[in-house]
Amino acid sequence: MAIRPLVTLPDPLLRQVSKPVERVDESLRKFAGDMLETMYDAPGIGLAAIQVGEPLRMLVLDVAEKDEPKNPQVFINPEIVSRSDVPSFHEEGCLSIPDYYAEVERPAEVTVKYVDLDGKEQIVEAKGILATCLQHEIDHLNGVLFIDYLSKLKRDMVVRKFRKLAKDRPPPARMVG
């Protein structure tokens, strides 16, 4: 397994819509392991493939509490099939927008259909932090960032800040595979 470089704002790759995974095979399982290792190293609780430069509809997450054993999960081609009408508010952050956090309103519960690492279709009914994390990461697969839920003024301030920071650092190396 390997830690992969993170794609950060304002990289336009983050706005790209990811393509469906065609086949679950050993190379995809290895990539899932790389994604989990990258997420834990960052540290974070969720990571979409696009955040490590791969425009695939795949995400990993682990929403276990710090005092609980790790619970890594991999979602391939995830799709939200239902949402509750009840709103939920959580402070969100993002490994692609480091050190910026904001409260975001999302549906409190979602049902997500996905494929697991064995190639089997699964369904999860999620609430709480799991629902929030799944929605955040699935948004990444659609080119949507959590700052898109903020007011235009706040969003523009964040984008300006990260554009300025990007001018001061070299572009990230991209792995081609």
UniProtKB/Swiss-Prot annotation:
Name the needed cofactors: Fe(2+)
Give an example GO biological process: translation
InterPro entries reported for this sequence: Peptide_deformylase, Peptide_deformylase_sf
Give the keywords, sorted. Hydrolase, Iron, Metal-binding, Protein biosynthesis
Co-factor binding details: Binds 1 Fe(2+) ion.
Does the keyword Iron belong to this entry?
A: yes
> Which amino acids does the record list as binding Fe cation?
C94, H136, H140
| EC number(s) from the headed UniProt entry | 3.5.1.88
Summarizing the function annotation, the protein's role is: Removes the formyl group from the N-terminal Met of newly synthesized proteins. Requires at least a dipeptide for an efficient rate of reaction. N-terminal L-methionine is a prerequisite for activity but the enzyme has broad specificity at other positions.
- Write down the NCBIfam families for this protein, in alphabetical order: pept_deformyl (TIGR00079), PRK00150.1-3 (NF001159)
| HAMAP family in alphabetical order | Pep_deformylase (MF_00163)
| Protein name, as recorded | Peptide deformylase
